[in-house]
Amino acid sequence: MQKTSMLTKEEAIKNRKWYLVDASGLVLGKLAVKAANLIRGKNKANFTPNQDCGDHLIIINSDQVVLTGNKKDNEFWYHHSQYMGGIKKTSGRDMINKNSDKLVFNAVKGMLPDNRLSRRLITKVHVFKNDKHNMEAQKPTLLNWS
């Protein structure tokens, strides 16, 4: 009978890679699902659910991501200023124009499980509004998710 082998932390860190994804023309939800699976390491043969075995991901052109249906006008994001009556509402169109990197980051974060491991995993996502990023030193591999 074969023994089950577990991935060690050192092996997971040693086998980490950097990937680059161009988000222009991609649907936000589909991009978030694929990104969450990549940073969790579900694409690897030695995936372990309780280990951080995923890769780093750089997402560029987040301002060109696509919201399907009427989400640009009918979906809203809320936040509060902590003052009385200080609730703020932002539409999808405004989120893409002003905070598209935050929109993509929060979509990926929402696709991860709610536990301590996900707080470590989300640090491996790097989102940029345009095609300029400061991660050239890591030599990322370009992924084509179109």
Swiss-Prot record:
Which InterPro entries does the record associate with it?
Ribosomal_uL13, Ribosomal_uL13_bac-type, Ribosomal_uL13_CS, Ribosomal_uL13_sf
Which terms are listed as keywords in the entry? Ribonucleoprotein, Ribosomal protein
- Give any single GO term for biological process: negative regulation of translation
- Domain of life, per lineage: Bacteria
Q: Which PROSITE patterns match?
A: RIBOSOMAL_L13
Membrane spanning segments where? Answer: none
Q: Which GO terms describe its molecular function?
A: mRNA binding; structural constituent of ribosome
Q: What's an example GO cellular component term for this entry?
A: cytosolic large ribosomal subunit
Q: Which family does it belong to?
A: Belongs to the universal ribosomal protein uL13 family.
**What PANTHER family has UniProt attached to this entry?**
LARGE RIBOSOMAL SUBUNIT PROTEIN UL13M, RIBOSOMAL PROTEIN L13
Purpose: This protein is one of the early assembly proteins of the 50S ribosomal subunit, although it is not seen to bind rRNA by itself. It is important during the early stages of 50S assembly.
| Name of this protein | Large ribosomal subunit protein uL13
The species this protein belongs to is Mycoplasma genitalium (strain ATCC 33530 / DSM 19775 / NCTC 10195 / G37)
Organismal lineage: Bacteria, Bacillati, Mycoplasmatota, Mycoplasmoidales, Mycoplasmoidaceae
- Encoding gene (name): rplM
